[in-house]
A protein has these predicted regions:
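Accessory "access/gating" subregions that flank catalytic or transport cores
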Residues: 1-23
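Structural motif
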Residues: 2-6, 45-46, 167-168
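Structural signal for hydrophobic packing residues in well-ordered secondary-structure cores
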Residues: 4-7, 11, 39, 43, ...
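Flexible loop/turn segments at secondary-structure boundaries
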Residues: 10-14, 53-58, 134-137, 174-177
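Acidic/glycine-enriched edge-of-secondary-structure segments
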Residues: 12-19, 97-102, 129-142
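Composition- and surface-driven signal marking solvent-exposed, interaction-prone regions
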Residues: 16-19, 58-63, 140-144, 180-182
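C-terminal catalytic subdomain
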Residues: 22-127
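Extended hydrophobic packing segments that form well-structured cores
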Residues: 114-201
Length: 201
């Protein structure tokens, strides 16, 4: 019912992965993809992040602009940003930074947003705890609380009831990722490639 883990500032794609709000969503969604087999239908994620507004503009020079655009102009969910993909992918300054300064390609942000939407589709709520600049998390549709305890109490009241099953993953993003499955294959609604079995629909 509840997944609990922390998100360091630097992992996977680089420094800022756990503080840049779009990259945070990608990381949260990656966890959903890894644990979907064991998550309940009303699952909640509680994740710690300093969420301090560090975008690492040198590595992802386009993500601050993408984040700002997501806050306006009828952008209600991440897929609403799709119409801007070609604009970013052909932005000459962002392409120059990709070619000459080791930045990611500007279309990479759309890949991250596409993945990032998976977390919203497959959870009842996602809480970020301990954020220094919580508005960045709220700007991505995440809930914010000061502590794990506050987040868990809110989740119990609103989503998972008073005795939820809690999976705590303290080494998340620090060691190799695991993909969890049900012990009984008949209860596992996905095969080893993530395809849903007909009996689970």
């Amino acid at each position: 019912d509840v997944l609990v883990f922390g998100m360091p500032q630097k992992f996977h794609y680089g420094d800022g992965m756990g503080t840049n709000p779009i990259m945070m969503m990608q990381a949260l969604s990656a966890q959903v993809l890894r644990f979907k087999r064991v998550m309940s239908d009303n699952c909640v994620i509680i994740c710690s992040s300093i969420c301090n507004g560090y975008f690492h503009d040198e590595l992802w020079p386009y993500l601050r602009e993408q984040y700002e655009l997501f806050q306006h102009d009828h952008m209600n969910t991440l897929p609403d940003m799709n119409r801007l993909g070609e604009y970013f992918a052909t932005n000459e300054e962002y392409i120059r930074k990709y070619r000459y300064t080791n930045a990611f390609h500007p279309f990479h942000g759309f890949s991250m947003m596409s993945c990032g939407h998976i977390a919203e589709m497959n959870t009842s709520a996602i809480y970020i705890v301990g954020a220094e600049e919580p508005g960045y998390a709220r700007g991505m549709g995440l809930k914010t609380r000061a502590t794990f305890e506050e987040a868990l109490e809110d989740a119990k009241k609103k989503y998972v009831g008073q005795e939820p099953n809690i999976l705590a993953l303290p080494m998340t993003f620090k060691k190799a990722a695991v993909h969890l499955c049900m012990k009984d294959p008949a209860q596992d609604c996905m095969d080893e490639y993530g395809h849903r079995h007909p009996c689970c629909c």
